[in-house]
Design a protein with these regions (language model features):
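ATP-dependent adenylation/nucleotidyltransferase module used to activate substrates
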Residues: 2, 8-163, 169, 199-207
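Electropositive phosphate-/nucleotide-binding environments in soluble metabolic enzymes
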Residues: 23, 27, 60, 132, ...
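Short, structured secondary-structure boundary patches
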Residues: 69, 125-137, 170-175, 227-244
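Residues that form or immediately flank small-molecule/cofactor binding pockets and catalytic motifs
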Residues: 86, 114-117, 194, 217, ...
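Short, surface-exposed helix-loop/turn micro-motifs enriched in polar/charged residues
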Residues: 115-118, 152, 216-220, 242
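Catalytic subdomain that performs nucleotidyl-dependent activation
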Residues: 158-237
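A short, charged, Gly/Pro-tolerant segment at domain boundaries
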Residues: 241-253
Length: 253
């Protein structure tokens, strides 16, 4: 059973998501979260979903939304979260805050450890090796603990910036998908924030006082993604509707 529009507006859903008590940014995020889940059939009855919790605003908001969604009767889903620590990267997160945040939302948090040896393949960047090992750790944990879906906190901006990167550097119009079954694991990746704007998540994070993490990855700003985010912002200055044109190009052709 998929999540459908009728379910969202039943009494239980209305009780959990009282729009009249929400700030404007919260309403925008919730509406787009619901639309993404419905349009791309992301939630099904019986799903066991593991959220990849980095500690950033996007994954925190994803925890909050899916925790609320799990309290609705149909479709019934179970939600837990996992935070991965890379032991050989000087990257700090406030684990106590993440544990408290998940506990407040009724979500069990798993702390996982991983690492990588960059000398094994000098052709690969630290970012690639870190991401690959994080994903492998997450996938193996999910399978061994009976999860069938992994929820990632990528929003619409992330997906479109990836599209621009692939067009520019690979000559491909591929990008991250709202739902993606994995070939080598009995898992499906879902991105429930796929239609949500980053600016709205940022506003919610400020209004709800999400705690910003102490330090981000020291290699984050050296990637092409940071440069392409600037390009994306320039496109929106040229045309405020640019994101919707790009989305239609990829997902509505």
């Amino acid at each position: 059973m998929y999540l459908d529009k009728a379910v969202l507006w039943k009494k239980g859903a209305a009780f959990l998501f009282p729009f009249q008590n929400m700030m404007k940014a919260e309403q925008k995020v919730l509406k787009r979260f619901n639309k993404g889940c419905v349009d791309y059939h992301l939630l099904e009855d019986g799903d066991r979903i593991l959220i990849a919790l980095s500690g950033g605003k996007d994954s925190l908001e994803l925890v909050r939304l899916l925790a609320q969604r799990a309290r609705i009767y149909k479709p019934h889903i179970e939600v837990e979260a996992a935070h991965i620590i890379m032991d050989n990267i000087p990257y700090e997160t406030d684990r106590s805050y993440l544990q408290d945040f998940c506990a407040e939302n009724g979500i069990k948090l798993h702390i996982l450890h991983s690492s990588f040896d960059e000398s094994t393949d000098p052709r690969k960047t630290r970012c690639f090796l870190c991401t690959w090992n994080r994903r492998k750790t997450l996938f193996e944990f999910a399978v061994s603990h009976g999860f069938n879906k992994i929820a990632l906190g990528h929003h619409m901006d992330d997906i479109l910036v990836t599209l621009l990167m692939n067009i520019t550097f690979e000559g491909s119009h591929s990008t991250m998908q709202p739902s993606l079954p994995l070939k080598h694991y009995p898992l499906t990746i879902i991105r429930p924030l796929c239609l949500v704007h980053e600016a709205d998540i940022r506003q919610v994070a400020e209004e709800l006082h999400f705690t910003k993490q102490k330090a981000l990855c020291p290699y984050e700003e050296t990637t092409r993604r940071a440069d392409m985010q600037t390009v994306f912002h320039h496109l929106e200055q040229l045309n405020p509707e640019a994101r919707y044109s790009l989305w239609r190009y990829v997902f509505m052709e």
